[in-house]
Amino acid sequence: IRGENGQKMSESKGNIIDPIDLIYGISLEDLLEKRTSNLMQEGLAEKIARKTKKQFPNGIESYGTDALRMTFYSIATNAKDISFEIGRLKGFRNFCTKMWNAARFINGYENKGNNFEAESESDKWILKEFEQLKADVEDNVNHYRLDLAINHVYEFFWNKFCDVYIEECKKTEKTDNLHPLLKEILIFIHPFAPFITEEIHSIIFKAPLIDR
């Protein structure tokens, strides 16, 4: 695994990042302590401290488990070297925020407990896109290309479901299909982002998703 500057992550370079720190965050002081303690080559401590302060002047932010999980999926390519970038992690944290915002918007409408009924052209379009997503992801997973699978999930949810379909529902004020479609999407995305999908489902549908 290589860091943002392309260098291989190693203790001697002082560029190893503990996944726990990416999930919960860590202060600069604690990060320096972690990176410079118990080094096999104590003379590297000062150099490592300088690099750490430059890269993380305010420590490491909290990104959450699902954002990190999806980031790891996205870099699971067939390449010999894997590059880990904080910017990519931020992108998936934003994706989680997008999921929250979409769910909050949909929760503002009454859940009539109905099934999805493809009446309008936009209904038919999003249903077709969702079926295509399922086929693409199944093929990706069968070929061990989780990077492609998570990219398809990201593209569908952000660009198609949120930016196109939800916006169309706002314009037409036809929102009956939002709840049943969101439910199916949460179930589908659950293996990639289990914590946020479980919580959203529990809040909106008043039932645990994991039982499905």
Model-derived features: positions:
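Conserved phosphate-binding loops in nucleotide/dinucleotide-binding enzymes
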Residues: 1-65, 79-92, 143, 147
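Helix-rich, typically C-terminal accessory recognition domains appended to large enzymatic cores
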Residues: 59-212
